[in-house]
Design a protein with these regions (language model features):
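Terminal non-domain segments
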Residues: 1-5
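Tandem repeat scaffolds
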Residues: 7-114
Length: 114
């Protein structure tokens, strides 16, 4: 199993400094943002503009994800163990059961095909 990674990018550094407004201001407006395998454990990410971000294989243990709209983000393989997700939107490819399994047991999110 892969381990969470501290990514070496300016945008990732903003998130780790809890500067969500700075991240939203500095992020590219189009094109994907690579946060694959990133370590987001325990971070408060509320108000994050997650559109276009690839969070594949990321770790969100105990992170505050309340109110984030992940519908335009990739979360395949991410772990949500003990994360706060009230009011968050998830991609339609993720079932509620899949999200609950990840929250309760730390399993990796698996996308279902339509």
């Amino acid at each position: 199993m892969s381990q969470p990674t501290l990514l070496d990018t300016p945008l990732y550094a903003l998130l780790h400094k809890d500067d969500i407004r700075g991240f939203n201001r500095e992020r590219p407006q189009n094109g994907p943002i690579d946060m694959v395998g990133g370590d987001f454990r325990g971070l408060d990410l509320r108000e994050l503009n997650a559109a276009g971000i690839d969070f594949s294989d990321a770790y969100f243990r105990s992170a505050d994800l309340r109110g984030i709209d992940f519908r335009q983000a990739s979360l395949e393989g991410a772990s949500l163990a003990h994360a706060q997700i009230s009011g968050a939107y998830f991609p339609p490819e993720l079932s509620a059961d899949e999200i609950l399994m990840s929250m309760n047991f730390g399993t990796r999110l698996r996308y279902r095909t339509r």
